[in-house]
Amino acid sequence: MISRKYGIPIYTTGGTADAMLRMKSLGKMPEGLIHEIREDEPFGIKDLTVNPFTIPHDAAQPVGYRLECGEHSVGIATDLGKYNDYIVKNLENLDAVLLEANHDIRMLQVGKYPYYLKQRILGDRGHLSNENAGRLLCRILHDNLKAVFLGHLSRENNYEELAYETVCSEVTLGDNPYRSRDFKIQVAKRDHISEIITV
């Protein structure tokens, strides 16, 4: 594991740390590299302030992040079964954001996944659909948002073009003064580095 090999610290919640330490596939984790963080308690890494916030997902104490450096901020929100006012507040007034657009609901419903897995993904502790990603984006749009990345797309239940078009449609049709062309919206690549954005 890269952390063990290069001595890179891991900042994670207690629940995630416990789950990692129990996973035999990860091998022995040097506990000195694991730094426990807590939801809604900002911490610093050099000039960066990291604000972890609770997200609804069926994992071991997962969090989203709001990263701040000076007057600039970036948000990361993946593995969300749903969003609420608390999540919206943590994603307001960002310069850039990475949002989950995991699946197209219809593709998931008619796809090959077993019923229990479909229900898990569609549930409140599952993953955000393209439509809900667009609706969440509508709640956090503002004049100074420079970039939106759509991420964590399902290989089986989504396409890059479909995620992009659906999110853009939600923005254009949403109850807000913006249109999708007002912002740089792009799909984060699974296997390639995305475009570098300066905020």
Language-model segments: residues:
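Core dinuclear metal-dependent hydrolase active-site scaffold
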Residues: 37-96, 196-199
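Short active-site oxyanion
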Residues: 5-10, 73-74, 183-184
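Active-site metal-binding loops of divalent metal-dependent hydrolases
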Residues: 15-16, 55-58, 78-80, 101-103, ...
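A short helix-to-beta-strand connector/capping loop
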Residues: 27-34, 46-48, 179-184
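Short, basic/aromatic-enriched C-terminal tail that caps enzymatic domains
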Residues: 183-199
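Active-site HxH/HxHxD metal-binding segment of metal-dependent hydrolases
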Residues: 1-41
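Cap/insert and terminal regions of metallo-dependent hydrolase folds
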Residues: 85-185
